Amino acid sequence: MPSLDYSQVTITALIASLAIGYLLGSIPFGLLLTRMAGLGDVRNIGSGNIGATNVLRTGNKKLAAATLLLDALKATAAALIAQKLFGSDTVHLPGLLGGFAAFIGHLFPVWLGFKGGKGVATYIGTLLGIFPLMVLVFAIVWLSIAFLSRYSSLSALVATLVIPVALWILGQPEAAMITSAMTVITWGKHKANIERLISGTESKIGKKG
């Protein structure tokens, strides 16, 4: 991805990119799918989260997988749409902001009182839209840490740390900065998980409780 030429990006384009991203990102697929499936309000079970992990607590694996996919793709769509409308071969800021805004929309959806998911799926979806190679890097890191630790949350957290570093090494400072911000926010949303990891009470992959 070439360096961004900020002089070619208008304020209107930036605002529109953010708006498109936020609106797409704020679609609560986890909540919508569980309601349509007759499983009630997913916010009333488990962690109260609208993401795929909490949807899985309903016992419906297919619905959880669908939630994961849709939460990722809404961020990908936001990045691609913003880039197509306002970006160019040398100007990628609209796409980057579209994906970032979708990530924020998922975490803080206005329709649900700004209480959304934890952002891992939309983080991955944003990567798919702005730098697809990083999805492979994320997957490799996640699988490696999961194999060693059996902690899903730890795997995701470590992967989000690696991505900005990898982008910086590859000469993508703008994408590195945006994903760094996303990483900080993701860690903040996983505060409870981090506390459980430290205390040794975090649930491991394949184990209940």
From Swiss-Prot:
One of its Pfam families is G3P_acyltransf
Q: Name one GO biological process term.
A: phospholipid biosynthetic process
Protein origin, superkingdom:
Bacteria
List, alphabetically, the InterPro entries matched. Answer: G3P_acylTferase_PlsY
Query: What catalytic activity does the UniProt entry give for this protein?
Result: an acyl phosphate + sn-glycerol 3-phosphate = a 1-acyl-sn-glycero-3-phosphate + phosphate
- Leading EC class: transferase
Location(s) in or outside the cell: Cell inner membrane
Topological type in the membrane: Multi-pass membrane protein
UniProt keyword 4Fe-4S present = no
Q: What is its EC number?
A: 2.3.1.275
Q: Which SMART domains match?
A: G3P_acyltransf
Cystine bridges: none
GO MF term list: acyl-phosphate glycerol-3-phosphate acyltransferase activity
Q: How does it assemble?
A: Probably interacts with PlsX.
NCBIfam families listed in its UniProt record = glycerol-3-phosphate 1-O-acyltransferase PlsY
Entry's family note: Belongs to the PlsY family.
Among PANTHER family, the record links this protein to: GLYCEROL-3-PHOSPHATE ACYLTRANSFERASE-RELATED, INNER MEMBRANE PROTEIN YGIH
Q: What does the protein in this record do?
A: Catalyzes the transfer of an acyl group from acyl-phosphate (acyl-PO(4)) to glycerol-3-phosphate (G3P) to form lysophosphatidic acid (LPA). This enzyme utilizes acyl-phosphate as fatty acyl donor, but not acyl-CoA or acyl-ACP.
This chain belongs to which protein, by name? Glycerol-3-phosphate acyltransferase
Upper lineage is: Bacteria, Pseudomonadati, Pseudomonadota, Alphaproteobacteria, Hyphomicrobiales
